[in-house]
Amino acid sequence: MKLLLASNNAKKLKELQRILDQAGLDSVELLALRDVEAYDEPIEDGRTFADNAQIKARAGVTHTGIATIADDSGIAVEELNGMPGVLSARWSGAHGNDTANNELLLAQMEHVPDERRNAAFVSVCVLALPDGQEFVQEGRWEGQLLRGPKGENGFGYDPLFIPAEEIDGQGRSSAELSAEEKDALSHRGQALRGLVEKIAQVAAAS
């Protein structure tokens, strides 16, 4: 079975591949957008993570005829009423500029005390099949915002986020966790694992 991940993000691709491997889904051939005939990527103008994930998954399966999985994710900061939210990747105005996004968020939270720095990573993953079926899973990873970046692993807001599991432990940011540790805890890992059973069913029937 071929499975398209509607992304060219190498780290997301590796993350999904690890989860498929852990589930023993050796029959699934994972593809990225660069592996299929190019198509115009849709405008992500949804109001929610689920909206945007559906937009991307539907575009992938429509243009390629291949079962497609897509995610939309970001960080929701309690003090900012859930923002950046769906705007996380372009919070500073430039899409995908992690450094600028992190710097802006830190500046906005500069005078906020520790007890009001609660945040959560949120991910919604959608699996869209050629027959029109869609399956949706959401993952949520609670924690707090740090006052400066820590760690070199991960991407996005990982260096600014201390997971709830680490607050009373070693105090590591999500950018200091190993890939395996992050897979086990993270919002995207939760959502992707929620789709594994359905992927296995589709693979067995193909």
From Swiss-Prot:
Q: Which UniProt keywords apply?
A: Hydrolase, Magnesium, Metal-binding, Nucleotide metabolism, Nucleotide-binding
Q: Looking at the record's lineage, which domain of life comes first? A: Bacteria
- Please list the reactions this protein catalyses: XTP + H2O = XMP + diphosphate + H(+); dITP + H2O = dIMP + diphosphate + H(+); ITP + H2O = IMP + diphosphate + H(+)
Which organism is this protein's natural source? Corynebacterium glutamicum (strain ATCC 13032 / DSM 20300 / JCM 1318 / BCRC 11384 / CCUG 27702 / LMG 3730 / NBRC 12168 / NCIMB 10025 / NRRL B-2784 / 534)
Q: How does it assemble?
A: Homodimer.
- Binding positions (substrate): 7-12, 73, 155-158, 182, 187-188
Which residues take part in binding Mg(2+)? 72
The uppermost taxa in this organism's lineage are: Bacteria, Bacillati, Actinomycetota, Actinomycetes, Mycobacteriales
The active-site annotation reads: 72 (proton acceptor)
What this protein is reported to do is described as: Pyrophosphatase that catalyzes the hydrolysis of nucleoside triphosphates to their monophosphate derivatives, with a high preference for the non-canonical purine nucleotides XTP (xanthosine triphosphate), dITP (deoxyinosine triphosphate) and ITP. Seems to function as a house-cleaning enzyme that removes non-canonical purine nucleotides from the nucleotide pool, thus preventing their incorporation into DNA/RNA and avoiding chromosomal lesions.
* Cofactor binding note of this UniProt entry: Binds 1 Mg(2+) ion per subunit.
EC assignment = 3.6.1.66
Q: Which cofactors, by name?
A: Mg(2+)
Read off the InterPro entries from this record.
dITP/XTP_pyrophosphatase, ITPase-like_fam, RdgB/HAM1
Q: Does the keyword Glycoprotein apply?
A: no
User: Annotated Gene Ontology MF terms?
Assistant: dITP diphosphatase activity; ITP diphosphatase activity; metal ion binding; nucleotide binding; ribonucleoside triphosphate phosphatase activity; XTP diphosphatase activity
An annotated GO cellular component: cytosol
Task: Name the protein family.
Answer: Belongs to the HAM1 NTPase family.
> Entry's SUPFAM superfamilies?
ITPase-like (SSF52972)
Can you say what this protein is called? dITP/XTP pyrophosphatase
* Pfam families linked: Ham1p_like
Q: What processes does the entry annotate via GO biological process terms? A: nucleotide metabolic process; purine nucleoside triphosphate catabolic process
Q: Could you list the residue ranges that cross the membrane?
A: none
